Amino acid sequence: MTHTHDHEHDHNHEPDYITLVEENGNESLFQILITIDGQEEFGKNYVVLQPTEFEEDEQGLIDVLAYSFTENADGTEGDLQPIPEDAEDEWDMIEEVFNSFMDEQED
């Protein structure tokens, strides 16, 4: 089955960063790899993050995180929400846009 999604995503050339604070107070710095405008299809925006301190696995892969987000009025901060595991259409769209983004980065 093939899906075609026409979603806008931000191609910042200078990296943006975000600090995530865990429940225990630990802070971790993440690079924002891509933001995805999913407003039309899902009524949400999405962000894909990569830890700034990471280790590749045996296959050279790095874990990334994806969240939906709501920006505050001035666009400088916002709230991240986990994407439900059973939201298959959302995950499919995020994966497709992210894979396209990564393919463009390799070119």
From Swiss-Prot:
Q: Give the highest taxon in the source lineage.
A: Bacteria
User: InterPro entries, per this entry?
Assistant: UPF0473 (IPR009711)
Give coiled-coil spans as residue ranges.
none
Query: Membrane spanning segments where?
Result: none
Q: Which family does it belong to?
A: Belongs to the UPF0473 family.
- List the HAMAP family: UPF0473 (MF_01448)
Write down the NCBIfam families for this protein, in alphabetical order: PRK13678.1-2
Could you identify this protein by its name? Answer: UPF0473 protein LACR_0139
Organism of derivation: Lactococcus lactis subsp. cremoris (strain SK11)
Identify the taxonomic lineage of the organism of origin: Bacteria, Bacillati, Bacillota, Bacilli, Lactobacillales
